[in-house]
A protein has these predicted regions:
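C-terminal helix/juxtamembrane-tail motif
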Residues: 321, 328-343
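Chitinase-like catalytic core of GlcNAc-active glycosidases
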Residues: 27-273, 277-303, 314-315, 330-336
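Structured C-terminal cap/extension of enzyme domains
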Residues: 310, 314, 319-320
């Protein structure tokens, strides 16, 4: 997913804009009654059960610093501030740091009351940590400490170092395994959310010399809560030499999305990935909100809703992800969930 990387001066100037009003309902006092603050914080961060309804936000929105009002994203249960890069926080992740501790606590409490977790997404299409020689353990330590410092519910690993994966020498997979292991050491399972956002083609069992995401899953899948699978051939935006009539329309029908991918990216439809050993409950279906959000893979909300209903009828319940707010809002997720998990 593409980071806008707004100039820091624009991000800094947004601090002076009014903090968006966040609507909320009172916390259920009985849930936290008798618990100390540490226990309350852990319960508030606890990993939610499927289905997961995830929305990313990287785009500058005038008048809003950090997350929007809860009413704007009702129906989602995870909001990903994007992106934390190897160089530091940018865009929505940076905006979060500019709020005072009291403001962050207020927003966090209101999102928690609405059942929405706040996480940070890291890397995106801008960072190429393996190709750049970044130490995975050191970087994981830095990023995990950032999550803790800024009181978020977890971290999403949107790794898009395509050159490293294409090399087929296993370095990308080894980097991800080390990075994930260290993240989970510092962000314990059940207390913090840890997700990955791979593109669907990386789950192919026949293409990647280093083993691809199936190797990553075999090594550390037990540490990853779920995968926000970018079933949008997003790498095609970056690697035009992979464009073909077949690839450009990949994952745009329910059959292609759920049961049988094309020969361009073999065995990467939802149920095919599950057949390769990844639990269905961990495979969240990711799509762009608009035709402008990605060069391919777009589905209308009605078509996507139909696909989700079909998947649910076959035992799937993982949920859906969208790139990004404000292209998608409460209305988008209400339409997408209408036939399967209505809001």
């Amino acid at each position: 997913m593409v980071s806008l990387l707004l100039a820091r001066i624009i991000s800094i100037s947004s601090v002076f804009l009014c903090l968006a009003r966040v609507n909320s309902t009172p916390l259920n006092a009985t849930v936290f009654d008798g618990l100390d603050q540490q226990a309350r914080d852990i319960l508030a961060r606890a990993t939610p059960a499927a289905p997961h309804w995830v929305i990313y936000s990287d785009q500058f929105v005038s008048g809003t610093t950090g997350p929007p009002a809860v009413s704007a994203v009702t129906g989602f249960n995870v909001f990903a501030l994007s992106f934390l890069l190897t160089e530091g926080a940018f865009d929505k992740a940076f905006e979060w740091t500019t709020l005072t501790a009291a403001q962050r606590a207020s927003v966090k409490a209101q999102y928690n009351a609405a059942g929405i977790k706040l996480v940070v997404s890291v890397f995106g299409s801008t960072d190429v940590p393996t190709s750049s020689g970044v130490n995975p353990v050191t970087m994981a330590t830095t990023m995990a400490n950032w999550v803790i410092e800024f009181n978020l519910d977890g971290i999403d690993v949107d790794y898009e170092d395509f050159n490293a994966f294409d090399a087929g020498d296993g370095k990308a997979e080894a980097w991800l395994i080390s990075f994930t292991t260290q993240l989970r050491t510092l962000l314990p399972q059940g207390t913090y959310i840890l997700t990955h956002a791979p593109v669907a083609p990386w789950f192919s069992p026949t293409i990647w010399g280093g083993g691809g995401y199936l190797k990553v899953h075999a090594a550390v899948g037990n540490l990853i809560d779920w995968y926000n699978v970018q079933v949008i051939s997003s790498e095609l935006r970056k690697r035009p030499y992979h464009f073909s009539a077949e690839g450009a329309t990949e994952y745009t029908t329910c059959a292609n999305l759920l049961t049988t991918s094309s020969n361009t990216w073999p065995q990467t439809a939802l149920f095919q990935i599950a057949s390769s050993g990844v639990p269905l409950s961990k495979l969240v279906i990711g799509k762009p909100a608009t035709t402008g959000a990605a060069s391919n893979g777009f589905m209308s909300t009605s078509t996507l809703a139909s696909c989700l209903a079909q998947a649910k009828s076959q035992g799937w319940n993982a949920g859906a992800m969208v790139w990004e707010y404000p292209g998608a809002t409460a209305a988008w997720i209400q339409a997408v969930r209408a036939s399967s998990f209505p809001v």
